[in-house]
Amino acid sequence: MNTKEIVNKYEFKFNKNLGQNFLIDESVLEDIIEGAEINKEDTVIEIGPGVGTLTKELLERAKEVYSIELDGDLIPILQEELKEYNNFTLIHKDALKIDFNELMENKDSIKLVANLPYYVTTPIISRLLTEKCDFKSLTIMIQKEVAERINAEPNCKEYGSLTVLVQYYCNTKIIRKVSPNSFIPRPKVDSIVIKLDRLSEPRVRVKSQKLFFNVVRSSFNMRRKTLWNSLKSLNIDKESMENAFERAGIDPKRRGETLSIEEFGKLSDCIYDIL
C-alpha cells in the first residue's frame, strides 16, 4: 500500500504540533533511496518514518533499520505494517533526546535517512555533527531555505554558521527539489533532498575546535558588522586581536560571510596562539 492508503486504512489524524508532512510522491522516494546508496552491509537509522513507506524500501536493502518516531499514534501502525521484517527496530522516542552515540555503538557502516519536521532540522544536524556521531552519510529531506544555507558558498546571503558547521565535517550534495504537492498535508514551503557525506577528517585542521566554532558563531551573530566589531564578543584585547588578524593575513574590515572555512581556521589558530 502507498502512504495515502495506509493513512486512510488506519484513519490517521495528522498532528500539527509535530509538523507532520508525509511524502506521497513515489519518484521522490526512489530518489531518496538511490541517493542514500543503501546496501546489505549498512545499518540505517531513520528519523521520522511516518507510516513506514520509505522504511519498507530501506528494510529491503539494508542489514538492519532503526526507526525513531515520536508520535505514539504512529507506533501501532508501524508495528503492524512492518511486522514481517526481522531486521526492524522501532524506537518510540524524541530524536532530540536520543543518545545517538549509544545507538550507533558496535555498529558498522551507519547511514542516516530522515524526513524531519522543519523545526528540528538544525538541532538534529548540529547534534549529529558536534557530538561526533560515527555515521557515513545523512540523506535528509529539509526545507529548501535550510538546504541552500547548508550548501552555500562564501559571499552570499545564505552562507552562515550552519554552512561552516556542516561543510567542516561533510561534503554536501543536493539530490533534488521537492514540491509541496509531494506531501500530505501540503506544506507551505518547498523542500530539498540533500545528502551529507561525512569526511574521514574535518575539512581543516585547527588547534581548537571550540575556539574555531566560537569565532565562526561570533562572526555571523551580527552579519552587517565587520569581523573586528563582531569578534569583540571574544573579549580579547585590541593589540592581541590586531596581531592575530595580521598573522592570519585577513583584513579585519571584512565581514564573516566573505571568509572561507580555511580562512576561519587560519584566523582561529592565530587567535589561539595569542591567548
UniProtKB/Swiss-Prot annotation:
Fetch the Pfam families from UniProt.
Answer: RrnaAD
Q: Name one GO cellular component term.
A: cytosol
Location in the cell: Cytoplasm
The record's InterPro entries line, in alphabetical order, gives: KsgA/Erm (IPR001737), rRNA_Ade_diMease-like_C (IPR023165), rRNA_Ade_Mease_Trfase_CS (IPR020596), rRNA_Ade_methylase_Trfase_N (IPR020598), rRNA_adenine_dimethylase (IPR011530), SAM-dependent_MTases_sf (IPR029063)
One GO MF term, please? 16S rRNA (adenine(1518)-N(6)/adenine(1519)-N(6))-dimethyltransferase activity
- Alphabetized UniProt keyword annotations: Cytoplasm, Methyltransferase, RNA-binding, rRNA processing, S-adenosyl-L-methionine, Transferase
In terms of one coarse class, where is the protein primarily found? cytoplasm
Catalyses which reaction(s): adenosine(1518)/adenosine(1519) in 16S rRNA + 4 S-adenosyl-L-methionine = N(6)-dimethyladenosine(1518)/N(6)-dimethyladenosine(1519) in 16S rRNA + 4 S-adenosyl-L-homocysteine + 4 H(+)
Indicate which residues the UniProt annotation says bind S-adenosyl-L-methionine: N21, L23, G48, E69, D94, N115
Per UniProt, the enzyme's principal EC class comes to transferase
Any keyword rRNA processing?
yes
- Top-level lineage group: Bacteria
- State the EC number(s): 2.1.1.182
As for what it does, the entry says: Specifically dimethylates two adjacent adenosines (A1518 and A1519) in the loop of a conserved hairpin near the 3'-end of 16S rRNA in the 30S particle. May play a critical role in biogenesis of 30S subunits.
Give the family per the record.
Belongs to the class I-like SAM-binding methyltransferase superfamily. rRNA adenine N(6)-methyltransferase family. RsmA subfamily.
UniProt protein name: Ribosomal RNA small subunit methyltransferase A
Q: Which organism is it from?
A: Clostridium botulinum (strain ATCC 19397 / Type A)
